[in-house]
Amino acid sequence: MKKLDILSRKSDLAVIQAHEFGEVLLSKYPSLKLNYITKSTSGDIDLKTPLSQMPSEGVFTNDLRDELINKNCDLIIHSWKDLPLDVGNQTEVAITLDRADPRDLLFIKKNSLQKIKQTSSISIFSSSPRRQYNLESFVKNYLPFQIKNIIFENIRGNILTRFKKFLDGNVDGFVVAKAAIDRLLNANQTDFPDLKNNLFLHISQCLWTVIPLSVNPSSPGQGALAVEIRSDDTNLKKLLSEINNEADYANVILGRQELQKD
């Protein structure tokens, strides 16, 4: 096996994650040639419908899986948490890499602080029912000012798009996966020359806190990358097994199995 076609979504974060995988793979197999491919999914195209109201699971993954099944690529790099619980029998998640930080970040605009103190009310961008449920208690009990009323508003788009909507709008807070911010900040400056600068500029306008897992358990697989291959590609599965983090893989699988019981 001399060359691999690696598919991901088109967002900066998805491309960064694909290259993160590629770097790990090349450290083990330096003679491999890697070709990176991107594709927009239905979840990328429809930016108006809240994720919880979209018609099916896999809005960020099913279109990519079709490409894999049709042999237009060799493997796909996903965020584990985007994958539906049942991926079917034509493909499988072969491995995962070392899991990044699974916690969430809460950003609050500095210029919203006075308003929050005066009204005892805060508005927060989050499209995740899990986060909305968990943050109700966290925001009221852990922030350094009294909060009586919390308003959650849906938001869609990639990280920088959401950050810009947050900073330009009237909403006070914004919740996002810490792993996503970490990966963007650690991106190769040559490949993404403006990304880091823009993100640092956005963050400088905010106060932020890391939300403990004890009050805001993450979704199974948050922070972990899933490498999906065709189920019959035994040679690729064997090759990839050399870079699998078995402990993180088992942890994600266990968490997803618990969800299937509900």
What do the predicted segments below correspond to?
Residues 38, 93-95, 108, 126, ...:
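Structural signal for conserved beta-strand scaffold positions within catalytic alpha/beta enzyme cores
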Residues 92, 105-107, 224-228:
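Residues embedded in well-ordered beta-strands
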